[in-house]
Regions:
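Active-site environment of divalent metal-dependent phosphoester hydrolases
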Residues: 15, 51, 76-81, 103-106, ...
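Short catalytic-loop micro-motif centered on adjacent basic/acidic residues
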Residues: 42-45, 70-73, 134-135
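Short, conserved acidic/polar surface loops in the N-terminal third of protein domains
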Residues: 55-56, 81-86, 107-110, 146-147, ...
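Active-site metal-binding motif and surrounding structural segment of the metallo-beta-lactamase
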Residues: 39, 50-97
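Conserved beta-strand hairpin/beta-sheet module of binuclear metal-dependent hydrolase folds
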Residues: 3-61, 148-151, 155-159
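Metallo-beta-lactamase
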Residues: 1-3, 41, 98-185
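Short, structured coil segments at secondary-structure junctions
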Residues: 90-92, 110-113, 152
């Protein structure tokens, strides 16, 4: 995405249904996770649990996991947080930045022992070096714990599901895919 920000998510070409029969996905989906490498390194979100081992293995090829200073969980529905347990087995002392409600949801899903949660609220910041993450709570925009993270310097808003849709493509940008397919979804 930039010299400091990489997409490290998963494209799921096989997914046809999400949330049961409520939501069909003609073109699969993607699970978006991002790695910010500055003076400090932050991982934003993970991927769905069926891909947890693959996610961690691919992440290891990208970076020594011990160099990840922070995990930021913008949203904790299982397609965003599903690989967190597998990742925390590797780097159990890494602090997890999320809203108070986000921590509650993670605890409800995974029953973690000894994880280091740092609860953030709107306006809180995390300095990474040249860039700073600013957190913006957006509860119930999509889910009770929804939070955005804005990366100053790079001018990137990590908005999780707020502007997204289920659509599998190798392109990271919506203006580089067939617009008819995009609108159908």
């Amino acid at each position: 995405i930039t010299n400091k920000v990489s997409w490290v998510g998963k494209i799921d070409w096989e997914l046809t249904k999400f949330h049961g029969d409520e939501l069909s996905t003609k073109h699969g989906s993607s699970y978006n996770a991002y790695l910010i490498e500055d003076e400090k390194t932050a991982l934003i979100d993970t991927v769905w649990q069926p891909y947890d081992k693959e996610f961690v293995a691919r992440l290891k090829k990208t970076i020594d996991l011990k160099k990840i200073d922070y995990i930021v969980m913008n949203h904790n529905e299982i397609d965003h947080s599903g690989a967190l347990v597998e990742l925390m087995r590797e780097i159990p002392d890494t602090p997890i930045y999320c809203t108070k409600k986000g921590e509650s949801i993670i605890r409800g899903h995974y029953h973690p022992e000894g994880w280091n949660f740092v609860n953030v609220k709107t306006g809180d910041t995390l300095n990474l070096g040249e860039n700073t993450l600013t957190f913006i709570e957006a509860p119930m925009l999509h889910w009770p714990d929804t939070m955005f993270s804005y990366l100053s310097g790079e001018n990137i808003l990590f908005s999780n599901d707020a502007f997204g849709q289920h659509f599998a493509t190798e392109s990271l940008y919506n203006d580089t895919v067939k617009q008819d397919d995009l609108m159908w979804e």
